[in-house]
Amino acid sequence: MKKPFRIGFGFDVHRLSEGYPLWMGGVRLEHSKGLEGHSDADVLIHAICDALLGAAALRDIGYHFPPSDPQYKGIDSKILLARVMELVRSQGYELGNIDATIAAEQPKLNPHIPDMQRVLAEVIQVEVSDISLKATTTEKLGFTGREEGISAYAVALLIAAV
């Protein structure tokens, strides 16, 4: 019997380095450093993808889009998110909501959250109100506090399609 609700959790982290663009939630942000990664290294979208895949018991982003596969080199993470939603929907589920937190010292992300919500909602094909995003710092502690990287955490609720 198909469960009416499923919950998934996702996490991602990438190193901040000069010479890379900074993508967050599908929005390019102006900053002196960007995130290193095989794709565009959008930690927020990657955490959301893992939460969605986890909720549907479909493993993780690295399984579906392995960094060893050259077709994903530099890929726009919005494309990966759209493909993940196709997989989720193929299992008979729709998104209930997403709640995500980004941990970064710089840049300040709160001014960009409405744009990120809009982009994510458009890619996932849901209402903006279904996407909750928050930004925090680590009070200068750890790799995030030293501005060596940015991490993101996400929870997704899936609802069985009627």
UniProtKB/Swiss-Prot annotation:
UniProt keyword list: Isoprene biosynthesis, Lyase, Metal-binding
Reactions the enzyme catalyzes: 4-CDP-2-C-methyl-D-erythritol 2-phosphate = 2-C-methyl-D-erythritol 2,4-cyclic diphosphate + CMP
A single GO BP: terpenoid biosynthetic process
Bound cofactor: record note: Binds 1 divalent metal cation per subunit.
Lineage start: Bacteria, Pseudomonadati, Bacteroidota, Bacteroidia, Bacteroidales
Record's function text: Involved in the biosynthesis of isopentenyl diphosphate (IPP) and dimethylallyl diphosphate (DMAPP), two major building blocks of isoprenoid compounds. Catalyzes the conversion of 4-diphosphocytidyl-2-C-methyl-D-erythritol 2-phosphate (CDP-ME2P) to 2-C-methyl-D-erythritol 2,4-cyclodiphosphate (ME-CPP) with a corresponding release of cytidine 5-monophosphate (CMP).
Coiled-coil segments on the chain, per record: none
GO molecular function annotations of the record: 2-C-methyl-D-erythritol 2,4-cyclodiphosphate synthase activity; metal ion binding
EC class of the enzyme, as a word: lyase
Pathway: Isoprenoid biosynthesis; isopentenyl diphosphate biosynthesis via DXP pathway; isopentenyl diphosphate from 1-deoxy-D-xylulose 5-phosphate: step 4/6
Source species: Porphyromonas gingivalis (strain ATCC BAA-308 / W83)
Site (Transition state stabilizer) location in chain: 38, 137
UniProt: 4-CDP-2-C-methyl-D-erythritol 2-phosphate binding residues: 12-14, 38-39, 60-62, 136-139, 143, 146
Quaternary structure note: Homotrimer.
One Pfam family, short name: YgbB
Binding site for a divalent metal cation: 12, 14, 46
Name of this chain's protein: 2-C-methyl-D-erythritol 2,4-cyclodiphosphate synthase
SUPFAM superfamilies, alphabetized: IpsF-like (SSF69765)
Nucleus recorded as keyword: no
Source superkingdom: Bacteria
PANTHER family registered for this protein in UniProt: 2-C-METHYL-D-ERYTHRITOL 2,4-CYCLODIPHOSPHATE SYNTHASE, CHLOROPLASTIC
